[in-house]
């Protein structure tokens, strides 16, 4: 994960235009007095009545700019056009051999039109980054193979890279040129003044566009086990836009694999809008905080697989940095959590932890610092995870996890964590 200098200031000020008052007034959540909450302070459980308030409809009720929010979003399955796409990418014999080439050409031709652009990617390995700029038309990148493994976008990018090394890795063949639609994204990273590029520039696929879709392909940050178990953020996919759909995809990495983010065109964390992301029928792999960010995200029938091969001393799946006035962060339902053989002994992975973004110097400030929200419901969790204490201390501040088990609890009480379970099946 990453710290934003300006984002930290904004977080401290909490210039969020009253998210609860604006968007969620009817959803002030309080425990049901007729049902005693289950669980412990280290593993709190929701009652059926409480869990019923966390639905995809409510996570996706509104999004976009808080000053003029968009209405409800009800994602339907991604459908492909019946006619062959005009934009086709293949390792050879196609109009484009690089995905970024097709993205640039499609945007240049269509401009800001609202008609969706479908880019067909033939089976093969594409070693490149793919950047989708803010304001692009709706774009669907889809793999033409029978399985998502047949189309793979990959590159090894480490948050610890110097700017010079980033330039060499990402743009050695002038994949990004001034005047290209995504040039500004590359330039934001290629001319940083910091010693390293940081998490924000370590993504293989990075979309700042609304209505972005990925279907039937794999994205890998192939840094993987080439580095030690220390801090080496390597993002496979980062999204900043609203109404993002990921369907039948495989996202592979180690630390920080999937970043469901909310940033502006200048690559700064913002608190004045909400991004919504829907992940369906997919696979995500990593070791530390490998699904993280501020978006309202729903994961439906997703397989989360935690690996130990990098020998990291800690392992966490989810790390949301939900704004304190937003009742909704991550909803995981009908999903599966597994781990490899490294977690079959006394060393266990955690389901997640809050990300107290921006509070490294101040410590957690109740009502001001981000307070990550998660509900994992109706899912299967294998023996790789810590059943008694599945949630870790917060990232950035090391704030100890504290679950609310009061019979009269409010589920958004800022004095407590907001990481919950409901009706999960833990394998012995």
For each predicted feature, which ranges?
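Short, Lys/Arg-enriched N-terminal segments with co-localized hydrophobic residues
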Residues: 1-10
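Sequence-level preference for short, compositionally simple segments enriched
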Residues: 38-92, 96-428
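Bacterial N-terminal signal peptides
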Residues: 19-27
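C-terminal motif of bacterial Sec signal peptides marking the signal peptidase cleavage site
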Residues: 29-31
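Bacterial N-terminal signal peptides that target proteins for export
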Residues: 10-18
């Amino acid at each position: 994960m990453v710290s934003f200098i300006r984002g930290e200031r904004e977080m401290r000020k909490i210039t969020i235009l009253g998210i609860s008052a604006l968007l969620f007034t009817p959803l002030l959540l309080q425990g049901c007095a007729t049902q005693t909450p289950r669980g412990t302070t280290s593993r709190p459980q929701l009652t059926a009545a409480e869990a019923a308030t966390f639905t995809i409809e409510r996570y996706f009720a509104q999004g976009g700019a808080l000053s003029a929010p968009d209405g409800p979003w009800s994602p339907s399955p991604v459908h492909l056009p019946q006619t062959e796409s005009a934009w086709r990418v293949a390792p050879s014999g196609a109009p484009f051999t690089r995905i970024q080439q097709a993205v640039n050409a499609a945007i240049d031709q269509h401009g800001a039109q609202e008609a969706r652009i479908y880019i067909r990617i033939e089976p093969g390995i594409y070693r490149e980054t793919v950047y989708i700029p803010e304001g692009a038309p709706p774009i669907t990148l889809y793999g033409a193979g029978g399985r998502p493994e047949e189309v793979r976008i990959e590159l090894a990018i480490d948050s610890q890279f110097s700017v010079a090394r980033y330039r060499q890795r990402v743009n050695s063949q002038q994949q990004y040129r001034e005047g290209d639609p995504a040039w500004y994204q590359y330039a934001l990273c290629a001319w940083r003044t910091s010693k390293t590029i940081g998490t924000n520039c370590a993504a293989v696929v990075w979309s700042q566009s609304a209505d972005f879709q990925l279907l039937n392909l794999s994205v890998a940050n192939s840094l993987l086990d080439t580095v030690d178990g220390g801090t080496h953020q390597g993002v496979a996919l980062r999204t900043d836009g609203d109404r993002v759909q990921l369907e039948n995809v495989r996202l592979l990495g180690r630390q920080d694999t999937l970043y469901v983010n909310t940033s502006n065109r200048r690559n700064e964390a913002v608190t004045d809008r909400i991004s919504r992301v829907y992940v369906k029928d997919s696979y995500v792999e990593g070791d530390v905080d490998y699904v993280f960010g501020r978006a309202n995200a729903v994961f439906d029938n997703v397989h989360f697989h935690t690996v130990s091969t990098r020998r990291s001393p800690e392992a966490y799946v989810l790390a949301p940095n939900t704004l304190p006035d937003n009742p909704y962060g991550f909803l995981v339902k009908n999903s599966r959590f597994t781990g490899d053989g490294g977690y079959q002994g006394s060393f266990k992975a955690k389901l997640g932890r809050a990300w107290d973004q921006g509070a490294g110097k101040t410590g957690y400030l109740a009502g001001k610092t981000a307070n990550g929200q998660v509900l994992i419901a109706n899912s299967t969790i294998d023996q790789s995870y810590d059943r008694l204490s599945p949630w870790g201390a917060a990232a950035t501040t090391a704030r100890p996890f504290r679950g609310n088990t009061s019979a009269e609890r409010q589920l958004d009480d800022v004095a407590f964590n907001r990481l919950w379970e409901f009706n999960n099946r833990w394998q012995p």
